[in-house]
């Protein structure tokens, strides 16, 4: 594994939690600027979710929800990953996504579910975030 020390290696990629609170778009830009090819994290296998959840629980300082790279760009429940990978795995929290009040188009890991399940949230909300990179 070629991941730097405080990054989580998984399936050829490296993941890191950042505790700085940012709006979703600013978090995605931060990941992209960190290193070319980095994005907010995308998930594709059931097995990735618990491993990442455990990593976040161990390293996340604070109670904030955590942005991942899923969003509803067209605002019609057609969810897309910022790294343009295939949306083949979704693990929503109960009664989600709901586009509550027609305002929630970005996806966060819910702290009350141990960061295992997802919720759609207002993109301007300030959250911690999870970057995914190749090193």
Curated annotation (Swiss-Prot):
InterPro entries: C-type_lectin-like (IPR001304), C-type_lectin-like/link_sf (IPR016186), C-type_lectin/snaclec_domain (IPR050111), C-type_lectin_CS (IPR018378), CTDL_fold (IPR016187). Ca(2+) binds at residues 96, 98, 104, 119-120. GO terms for molecular function: carbohydrate binding; metal ion binding. Residues 10-132 form the C-type lectin domain. Disulfide bonds join 3-14, 31-131, 38-133, 106-123. PROSITE patterns: C_TYPE_LECTIN_1, C_TYPE_LECTIN_2. It comes from the Eukaryota. GO terms for cellular component: extracellular region. Gene3D superfamilies: Mannose-Binding Protein A, subunit A. It is found in: Secreted. Expressed by the venom gland. Pfam families: Lectin_C. Its main location: secreted. Keywords: Calcium, Disulfide bond, Hemagglutinin, Lectin, Metal-binding, Secreted. A motif (Galactose-binding) lies at residues 96-98. The keyword Secreted applies. Belongs to the true venom lectin family. Lectin that shows calcium-dependent hemagglutination activity but does not induce platelet aggregation in the presence or absence of calcium ions and vWF. Does not inhibit platelet aggregation induced by botrocetin and vWF. Homodimer; disulfide-linked. This is C-type lectin BjL. It comes from Bothrops jararaca.
């Amino acid at each position: 594994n070629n991941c730097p020390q405080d990054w989580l290696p998984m399936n050829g990629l490296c993941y890191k939690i950042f505790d700085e609170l940012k709006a979703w778009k600013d978090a995605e830009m931060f990941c992209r600027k960190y290193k070319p090819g980095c994005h907010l994290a995308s998930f594709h296998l059931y097995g990735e979710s618990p491993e990442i959840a455990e990593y976040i629980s161990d390293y996340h300082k604070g109670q904030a929800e955590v942005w991942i790279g899923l969003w509803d760009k067209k605002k019609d429940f057609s969810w897309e990953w910022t790294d343009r990978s295939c949306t083949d795995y979704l693990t929503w929290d109960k009664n989600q996504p709901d586009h509550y009040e027609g305002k929630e188009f970005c996806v966060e890991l819910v702290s009350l579910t141990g960061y295992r399940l997802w919720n759609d949230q207002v993109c301007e909300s300030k959250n911690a975030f999870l970057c995914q990179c190749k090193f």
